[in-house]
Amino acid sequence: RDTGEIFFQNERVFNKSEKLVPGTKGIAIVHQDFQLEPGYTVYDNIRHHLIQFQKSYQESKTEEIITLCHLESIRNQTSKELSGGQKQKVALAKAIIEEPPLLLLDEPFSNLDNISKAEFKTILKNIVKKLTISLLFVTHDSIDALTFSDEILIIQNGELLKKGTPSDLIQKPPSKYAAQLLG
């Protein structure tokens, strides 16, 4: 089945023939491939998204986001010099530079070692708190879903099975599939 619509801030943003994010005002995404400008430094990759603003604002906002995403030590490196975890943090910084109300993350923890994962989760929590934005992330890792989410949507074969808090879903899984998925 491929039916239904998605609304964001009371406007329809998705149907079968449309894409959810590109061009949808107020929604930003961190892709798995990061989409960084190869010859740009970390600083320029982030600042590039503020080109329409005055230079003083570009600089102050870029500095704020660099600090928020813990990128100070690599600010002058180009994207080709960065590790995967560093690239992911730069992609995150690019996505939040205009403070979207909603941030989508595609498997944000899947390619990170435990130390990098813990740091990235801390950064995300700080972003949510400081910028008051919402996160929606896709994961196949039940531990990440259960330990990092306020609410979980369990989807099977493209259909929503259940929405609930991690503790509610663990205590009363809606199906055998959900119980297996959540461990």
What role is predicted for each listed range?
Residues 16-18, 35, 40-59, 68:
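ABC-type ATPase nucleotide-binding domains, specifically the catalytic core motifs of the NBD
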Residues 78-82, 86:
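Conserved ABC ATPase signature
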Residues 163-164, 172:
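ABC ATPase "signature
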Residues 97-101:
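A short, proline-enriched helix->beta-strand linker immediately N-terminal to the Walker B motif
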Residues 12-28, 52, 169-173:
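ABC ATPase NBD coupling module
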Residues 57-74, 125-126:
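Conserved ABC ATPase "signature" region
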Residues 157-158:
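Conserved ABC ATPase "signature" C-loop
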